[in-house]
């Protein structure tokens, strides 16, 4: 594990993304798959991004320095977790969960 444990929280948009993922699969007749993806994405975000070293090494998506929006690619790079890290407060805000095949999100 890394240097410090960070507090990770999901924004409203990130929570809505998880709901949309579950709905997407439910509409395709695979509700269990959607629930599993949503649960696994949430767990991965809170586990991985609570580690300061992991959070610091996310690829910069937009901005720079303390205001940089970073991304963590997960599940064989199929999903992207966009987040902001505030080193001073020790908090990470998960902004969006995004499938890699979709157009770039507006953040």
Model-derived features: where do they sit?
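Basic, Lys/Arg-enriched alpha-helical interface segments
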Residues: 1-69, 88, 105-107
